């Protein structure tokens, strides 16, 4: 397989990333650095990701300035970067190629055996499980994941083999750049609708186009349990393997039970003469579906069942996906702390179900930070319904993610709607540190406390552990 460096290394030696700390950007930056490119990048604040990249030898700037790109022959941007960014403006003036993140990922994948995982929910976990199994099989893949693997503390690595595993992002339709050999569609849901002119059919059509990027001998592995996926099934004209709990699935999970913090089930797949058992070191039925997708990929790669079984039994998960942070001691009350990235009602529902199944007869106390005004507006009724099922709820202000406010869409109006819908009385706060003042008055002994959201709430578990352990 031709090395990417041989293709344009003579022309492109230094690559600059605008917004390098983004989950999709940092992984590509790390792989390119390990391929031998000079990598620089800018972001508005220092964090663990920028620290890691700096330790590797990347040049990191903590503000956006035109001088940051002085040595670059290409500038990589994510969809979050606006045209008025000074580095983008300077790149235009100097006629430096401006490369969308997904186009750079596609360039990496073009010279490898690509495995692309798409879907509204479950991409990161599914990608991580596939990566873990391939590593256990000693296939040494390159991988670029939107979350941090708990086992290694990283989200990207340059492998020695031709395999490249990556998430395929539908949020800005950039997954249409990717041309893989194998692909997964986990589900299709109403999310990032502005990209598709608020037309759900256009979103579904994009997933059909994603599947069409496979070669005629490629395979698309899809969840037959999902309504949105079923609606495009007849439009996919590539070999298909289906998975799910449904009796009609090619790969089906049966005999499901939870044992402590594991899911145990059997796999039926007609490639094998009899069912084989799985012990998954994660909780939640949604994670069984993610695992079925991963099994489909790994069976296509002829990975032995015993390796798949061993890998799933010791998979340690992904940061901020039902991440257990241990016990808190709040005024001598013992509280189990979990953290999750969930920010869509369907994701939140899956997390709630998983924790309630695991901690039956215990209260679920939730601290939720809504993410984006547009999402809160579009899914307001669904948020109201799902959040009402918590036993206690603290709402932080909406994390805007560069969006402008929408009239009457805020955490206070969401709290009012929840009060009207149910008997729950949410507490609304503007400052995370205020949680330390009110939490002792909310929790009971043996409660399960969940911090939830895709914004800066990710810093809250450490604050809680610092003060309550």
From Swiss-Prot:
Keywords: ATP-binding, Cell cycle, Cell division, Cell shape, Cell wall biogenesis/degradation, Cytoplasm, Ligase, Nucleotide-binding, Peptidoglycan synthesis
InterPro entries per the UniProt record, alphabetical: Mur-like_cat_sf, Mur_ligase_C, Mur_ligase_C_dom_sf, Mur_ligase_cen, Mur_ligase_N, MurCDEF_pg_biosynth, UDP-N-AcMur_Ala_ligase_MurC
Compartments (UniProt record): Cytoplasm
GO MF term list: ATP binding; UDP-N-acetylmuramate-L-alanine ligase activity
Pfam families the UniProt entry points to: Mur_ligase (PF01225), Mur_ligase_C (PF02875), Mur_ligase_M (PF08245)
Catalysis: reaction(s): UDP-N-acetyl-alpha-D-muramate + L-alanine + ATP = UDP-N-acetyl-alpha-D-muramoyl-L-alanine + ADP + phosphate + H(+)
Annotated positions binding ATP: 119-125
E.C. designation(s): 6.3.2.8
Main subcellular localisation: cytoplasm
Free-text function comment from the UniProt entry: Cell wall formation.
Protein name per UniProt: UDP-N-acetylmuramate--L-alanine ligase
Species this protein is from: Vesicomyosocius okutanii subsp. Calyptogena okutanii (strain HA)
This protein's encoding gene: murC
